C-alpha cells in the first residue's frame, strides 16, 4: 500500500470511529428526550384524572429513592409547573395541560431533528464503509 493510501485509510478509519461516537451520543440524547416526552404524557394523564375527580383525593407521593408518603389532595385548582431556568408558575389544570402539551410537541420536533441527524450520520458511515470496501487491493 502506498503511503498516501495508507494515510487515506487511517483518515477514513478515524472518521468512522468519530461518526460512530457521534451516533452513540445522538442515541443517548434521543433516549433522554423520549423519557421527557413520556414524563409529559404521564403528567397530562394525571392532571386530566385529577381534574375530573371530586372531593379530596387520597394518593401516594414519591419522595425519592423508592420512598412514598400518603397524602390527601384537597385542591387541584392550582398546579405548579416548571417553565425553565428554575422558575415555576401556578396554573389552572387546563393551563398546565396546555403547557405540557406544547412542551411535548416541542420535544417531538427535537426527536425529528435527532432522527434526521442519525440518518445523516448513517449515510456518512455507509459511504465510508463503501469507500473502504471498494478500494483495490494493494
Curated annotation (Swiss-Prot):
It comes from the Archaea. One of its GO terms (biological process) is protein folding. One of its GO terms (cellular component) is prefoldin complex. Its main location: cytoplasm. Belongs to the prefoldin subunit alpha family. Molecular chaperone capable of stabilizing a range of proteins. Seems to fulfill an ATP-independent, HSP70-like function in archaeal de novo protein folding. This is Prefoldin subunit alpha. It comes from Methanococcoides burtonii (strain DSM 6242 / NBRC 107633 / OCM 468 / ACE-M).
Amino acid at each position: 500500500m502506498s503511503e498516501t493510501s495508507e494515510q487515506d485509510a487511517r483518515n477514513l478509519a478515524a472518521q468512522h470511529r468519530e461518526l460512530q461516537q457521534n451516533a452513540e451520543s445522538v442515541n443517548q440524547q434521543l433516549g433522554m428526550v423520549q423519557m421527557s416526552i413520556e414524563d409529559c404524557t404521564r403528567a397530562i394523564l394525571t392532571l386530566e384524572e385529577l381534574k375530573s375527580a371530586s372531593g379530596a383525593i387520597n394518593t401516594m407521593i414519591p419522595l425519592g429513592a423508592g420512598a412514598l408518603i400518603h397524602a390527601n389532595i384537597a385542591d387541584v385548582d392550582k398546579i405548579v409547573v416548571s417553565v425553565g431556568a428554575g422558575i415555576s408558575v401556578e396554573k389552572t389544570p387546563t393551563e398546565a395541560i396546555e403547557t405540557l402539551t406544547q412542551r411535548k410537541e416541542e420535544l417531538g420536533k427535537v426527536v425529528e431533528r435527532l432522527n434526521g441527524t442519525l440518518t445523516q450520520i448513517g449515510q456518512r458511515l455507509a459511504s465510508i464503509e463503501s469507500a473502504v470496501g471498494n478500494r483495490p487491493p494493494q
